[in-house]
Swiss-Prot record:
This is MFS-type transporter pytF. GO terms for cellular component: plasma membrane. SUPFAM superfamilies: MFS general substrate transporter. GO terms for molecular function: transmembrane transporter activity. It holds the Pfam family MFS_1.
Length: 296
């Protein structure tokens, strides 16, 4: 870090000390929540709908591939999403949200257009796993970081509202995808989805804005990082999240195939993904509000 950057960070720290803190409301803060809702509707809504792709690929596009091989397409998406925090978190700290949100929006729409052209397994890995996974990471981390800038005492509620976007997306996308595949076919179905995604994410690029200015040095110092890594509460959270995430996405990937193996027709089996996502809608808001009241 240069002397100039150090001085800039010292000035920023002084500004933060004088700052009254997150407003916990107001037009600008709730606009960030709305932008996050739109982002999660597209990103996690689509991730939560992978079971639709899993079933369709096995039946139509990749019949020679095993269920395990096809599930790697979705699994790599999740890997890139979560590992992406190591790279995109510091970028947000140093540059703000737009430098991630705008290219992330373009990359996500591009990935869906590219998936519409895929015919071979490796092409799906490149377009749907690699491009889409990176794009989701570029949108995910600025959103959760910006929410913490604007909310403190009501952060759980705000994040719960944002997360309902993933529930509503998980309800809508399986039904939309199934209908589009039946009416216009897979290629044009994905292109239409790409246009819809862009239309929803474009305004979010200008809604999800941090309250605090970026740090020129790129976020935490080595001393801050070292102190955080020594905190037992941090490691308890990490271990807890490991077990939560470990099995969380399995139903979203496999419930249609499981249902069809037990005699359920393919259309209703696909609808089970929407039903599964609907079950999480109320819980996301209620659990967030309770976290604010009872402690996080």
């Amino acid at each position: 870090m240069t002397t100039k950057e150090a001085i800039a960070d010292m000035a920023l720290e002084a500004q933060e000390e004088d700052d009254a803190g997150p407003p916990d409301g107001g037009f600008r803060a709730w606009l960030v929540v709305l932008g996050g809702f739109l982002a999660y509707f597209v990103t996690f809504g689509m991730l939560n709908s992978f079971g639709t792709f899993q079933e369709y690929y096995g039946e139509k596009l990749l019949p020679g591939r095993s269920t395990s091989e096809i599930s790697w397409i979705g699994s790599l998406q999740l890997f890139l999403l979560f590992i992406g925090g190591l790279f995109f978190g510091p970028v947000f700290d140093a540059k703000g949200s737009k430098v991630l949100f705008i290219p992330g929006t373009l990359l996500l729409s591009l990935s869906q257009m590219m998936v519409s052209l895929c015919k071979e397994y490796y092409q799906f890995i490149l377009a749907q796993s690699l491009l889409f996974g990176i794009a989701v990471a570029m949108l995910f981390y600025p959103t959760i970081s910006a929410i913490s800038h604007w909310f403190h005492h009501r952060r759980g509620l705000a994040m719960g509202i944002v997360l309902t976007g993933s529930s509503l997306g998980g309800i809508a996308w399986p039904l939309i995808l199934e209908r589009l595949f039946a009416v216009v076919g897979f290629p044009w179905g994905l292109r239409i989805v790409g246009f819809i995604s862009f239309a929803l994410l474009a305004p979010a690029c200008f809604m999800v804005i941090p309250r605090l200015p970026p740090r020129k040095s790129g976020g935490l110092s080595k001393a801050d990082l070292s102190e955080g890594l020594k905190d037992r509460r941090y490691w308890l959270t990490v271990v807890g999240m490991l077990f939560v995430i470990w099995g969380m996405f399995i139903p979203f990937y496999y419930i249609p195939l499981f249902a069809m193996d037990h005699g359920v027709n393919s259309s209703f089996a696909n609808s089970l993904i929407s039903i599964l996502n609907a079950g999480s809608f109320v819980g996301r808001i209620v659990s967030g509000a309770l976290a604010d009241k009872l402690g996080r």
